[in-house]
Structures are given as C-alpha cells and as structure tokens.
C-alpha cells in the first residue's frame, strides 16, 4: 500500500459514531462530535502539527503544518467534516474486499442486502481495486472520514515520512455538523488564516467542484377552520386540503425526482397536520441566482393568491436562505481551480468539473471571504448501507493534495 497508515486511520475513524443531530441546539450537535474533535486534536499533535487548538465557538479543531520553504507562497487550508449523515452509525463494521473483479455481487455482511453492479454500475469502475464497504447494518462514513484520513495522511507524509518535500504553510481543520447544514455557520476565517482552501468532501476520483446550489428552506403554516364534517358545507376550511392545493400549485416537474444537471427544484420534506392546522416543510434549490429568487417569490405568490381567494390570511410562508452558489465568489479568481485541475492532470486523473446538486461547507465559507472549492475524497453511494470507497482512490486523493502543494510552490505571493 502506498500510504501504509491511510487505511488503518480510516477504519479507526469510521468505527466512531459521529452522526449529527438536526434537532440539537448545541454546537457541535452531539457530545460525540466534541469528543472526536478532541481525539483528532491529540492525533494532530502526535503527528507534529503545531498550534493545534479546539474552538469552543464552532466545534472545529485546527492545526498547522509549518512551512519549510523561504519562498513567499500562498497559505493553503484543508478542511473535512467529522460528522456522518442521518443513518445508523452505531457499530460500523467495515468490510475489506481486495482485488474486486468489477462484476461480482458483493454481499453486505449477514444481511440480505448486496452491492450488485446491475443496481450500482459504478462498481464496474473499480476492477482490481480494494474496496471498503459496510456490513449492511450501518452507513460506512466515508463521507467524510475518507477526507479526514486523507488529510491526516498528507500531514504525516509532510511532517514525518518526507519532511524534505517543499511546502508553504498549510492549515488543517476538522469540523462538525456539515450533514445537517450548519457546520460552517460559525467558521472563523480569521483564525484559519489562509489564502484559499479546499474541502476534501467530494465523491469519485477526479471530482473538482466549485459550483453549488443556492439554497433556501420554507415552512408553510396552514390555518384551517374545523367543524363537524356532517355540517361542514360552506363552513369548514380543511388545513390539510390547503396544503395539498398549495403543493399542487408548484410546478409539477420541478421536483428532485424529475430534475438533473443544472435544473433546480422544490422539494417537499415533510407534511403533517389536521383539518384545523397543517405544516409543510420545503427546500428550494437552484444554481442560477435569478431563478433561485424567482422560486422563492413564487412560493410567496401562491400563498398570497390563496389568501386572496379565501378572503383570510390562512397560508403563511416563512422562507429563509441557507447558502449560496459559491461560484459567484470563486469565479472571481479561478487560479485555485486551475491549480487543482493541473494537479490532477499531472497525475493522469481526469478532472470531473460539474455543478454540485447540493452544497458543501465551502459554500458558506466562500461567502465569508475564503474561496473554498471541493475535491474528491472517494466515497460512493454515500449516506446509507450501500456506501463504499476504493482505497486506491483515497491514495490518489492524497497524491492530488501533494501535487497541489507542489504546484503552489511555483506561485509567489
């Protein structure tokens, strides 16, 4: 194996349950994330990182790989998140399959679940590689403990294995709660103190992402007027029916299951209630700022029209922006995309530059003034029992980081 400790690190990290909790009011959202961040801090110190510190304000643990060059080069930041998605993460039992043939069905532990190339054709890309997958009872946690392990392996390489590898100052940060959308809300750009950064939180080999959705959340409250159904004519106002009418007024084809590429959508996450009162929760997504604003305006317009027809204010939307398309920031200086693209090409990796149909911590951090695109970490089928990662892809992620650092040495501030 190219990086001897990469896989052991990854296996150690995924066995720790760091599932974030969207119902929590604390930062980080769980005590387990606090404890894991402190554990990572100790590991960072053991590798030789300097100025390792935990920020109570945001749950990030930060450390520095000091420069070993006199060149005045840009300071690079590397970020990954410690939490995992909303799926069982207790008792993660990673399975290792060496020299996968690219065709066989992979049994997931003792469960009835399998990774079948007929269902997951991406498996065919991994012939001859070593895969780490689940036992079918949990997620794997490659999102984003692959990124955590890769950054730690990079640090080990620069500080201990090949300390003569020339580099400027590199800052490392591991944070909480990316999966519940609040991890970067309190990120401290001044404390991180770099010129640009990357999140190592992408998927398959070659992913290089700097364009995300712009995102908003909407909660629609529906106030009904409930009476006995036997005498309801011209009197009852059924809040659930109002919710149905509202949803049906949205564009039929602007839904996640009917869109792709750069197409945006409205997504109904939750609907509950009674004839007296109901509540619908939506997310709104689009890559283009104009269309994003039009979608938010439409949700208000539908409510206004329904209220006008009812003659009463019974439909009450609350719409809040969540994050924005970081391309608006990064396109002002594409050099950090160019250097990552060049690094991959130098390693015979084909860059995959496509808009993310989602967001990353980098979306928010970029709008705080620190451009932060996203690099591949290797995970496939993330957020569930069918998740897997290739060890060889993880190794190439470390290679890519090293090549970015090498190329950065040629850019004098």
From Swiss-Prot:
Its EC number is 3.4.11.4. The active site is at residues 83, 178. Keywords: Aminopeptidase, Cobalt, Cytoplasm, Hydrolase, Manganese, Metal-binding, Metalloprotease, Protease, Zinc. GO terms for molecular function: cobalt ion binding; manganese ion binding; metallopeptidase activity; protein homodimerization activity; tripeptide aminopeptidase activity; zinc ion binding. Zn(2+) 2 binds at residues 143, 179, 383. It is found in: Cytoplasm. Disulfide bonds: none annotated. Its cofactor is Zn(2+); Co(2+); Mn(2+). Optimum temperature is around 44 degrees Celsius. The enzyme is stable up to 50 degrees Celsius. It is an enzyme of class 3 (hydrolase). It comes from the Bacteria. Its main location: cytoplasm. CDD domains: M20_peptT (cd03892). Optimum pH is around 8. The enzyme is stable in a pH range of 9-10. One of its GO terms (cellular component) is cytosol. GO terms for biological process: peptide catabolic process; peptide metabolic process; proteolysis. Activity is strongly inhibited in vitro by chelating agents such as EDTA and 1,10-phenanthroline as do the reducing agent dithiothreitol and the oxidizing agent N-bromosuccinimid. Phenylmethylsulfonyl fluoride, a serine protease inhibitor has no influence on the enzyme activity. On the other hand, bestatin, an aminopeptidase inhibitor strongly inhibits the enzyme activity and leupeptin, a modified tripeptide, slightly inhibits it. Zn(2+) 1 binds at residues 81, 143, 201. Homodimer. HAMAP family: Aminopeptidase_M20. Belongs to the peptidase M20B family. Cleaves the N-terminal amino acid of tripeptides. This is Peptidase T. It comes from Lactococcus lactis subsp. lactis. The lineage of its organism: Bacteria, Bacillati, Bacillota, Bacilli, Lactobacillales.
